[in-house]
From Swiss-Prot:
It holds the Pfam family Oxidored_q4. It comes from the Bacteria. Keywords: Cell inner membrane, Cell membrane, Membrane, NAD, Quinone, Translocase, Transmembrane, Transmembrane helix, Transport. NDH-1 is composed of 14 different subunits. Subunits NuoA, H, J, K, L, M, N constitute the membrane sector of the complex. The keyword Cell division does not apply. The chain crosses the membrane at residues 8-28, 63-83, 90-110. It comes from Chlorobium phaeobacteroides (strain DSM 266 / SMG 266 / 2430). Its EC number is 7.1.1.-. GO terms for molecular function: NADH dehydrogenase (ubiquinone) activity; NADH:ubiquinone reductase (non-electrogenic) activity; quinone binding. Belongs to the complex I subunit 3 family. It is an enzyme of class 7 (translocase). The keyword Transmembrane helix applies. It is found in: Cell inner membrane. This is NADH-quinone oxidoreductase subunit A.
Amino acid sequence: MDQTLSSFGNVFAFLALGIVFVAGGYLTARMLRPSRPNPAKNSTYECGEEAVGSAWVKFNIRFYVVALIFIIFDVEVVFLYPWATVFKSLGVFALVEVLVFAGILILGLVYAWVKGDLDWVRPEPKVPQMPVMPDRKAEGGRA
């Protein structure tokens, strides 16, 4: 128990030292830098050319869906690699845990596939057309 706490103590000390180092560098740079804003510095920079149009570019939402699916399975590989390195010593229970983990991710992939999020060009949905009933008032009849 003592060794576990001292190991975590080392991790927390390293984490605290890293945070202090980054925050100290940021604050030192902020205090020492010159601050002379002008319109040229605050404008959009495009390789030395005058900016054309807005800096806000609209991306197709499908790029984000593909990126999120990639990140999910990339993180899966990050979790599976340490498990694979010690697989023999963990036993059957760890194998079942990993199969459940992979199964949940595969179910998510199948759901995205069935929903059509993996199709780049989606087919247009067919909307049923209702027949137009003639207006009897326009024909002079009773309604």
